Amino acid sequence: RLDDYQHLRRLGTSVFAVSYRGYAKSEGSPSEAGIYRDGKVAFDYVAKVMGFLPSRIFIFGRSIGSTVATDLAQDKDIAGLILVSPLSSARDQASVMGLGFATPLVGTAFENDKKIKRLKAPLLVMHGTRDQIVPIRMGRKVFDAAISQKSFHEIEGAGHNNLSNRFAKSYWTTISVFLKQSSKNR
């Protein structure tokens, strides 16, 4: 991911990355409520301590990070939301993983497809056509549910973990254009 952060810097952005509790080298155990809190603390730090206006902040979430990004972005006056390979809900993800029997157990967890309806900011959804971890239909479901200004970028042949490197030109050009267009409207 460091390469991705460096690329975002080359596009002229400041980057504040979060490692959620229980992920990577972060301590603690992951939970839906916990990672949402981590996202909120990070956003509040960037806005209140670092002094960035929320209307100039883009929130970026990839895969499971899309759930934190979507939860955080709802009802906020931010510059934009970028979701890469977003899952639509834990229920849908359990079904994709062959855990259909578990769908009643996940309840309303990670419901991007519901929360995205409260997004006011511009939205960019990017997804690979060959994503076998979070199928593209989930990204489309999130996109279709959004009512804000939105665009969907499908990357032909891309899987779940190779969008930013193997398909770099399409990926980074799309992000660059979105950042410029959304910033212009602020």
How should these model regions be labeled?
Residues R1-Y45, A73:
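Membrane-embedded segments
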Residues R118-K120, V125-H127, D131:
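Short beta-strand/loop motif that positions the catalytic acidic residue
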Residues D4, N112, A121, P135-D144:
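Short alpha-helix in the alpha/beta-hydrolase fold that links the catalytic acid
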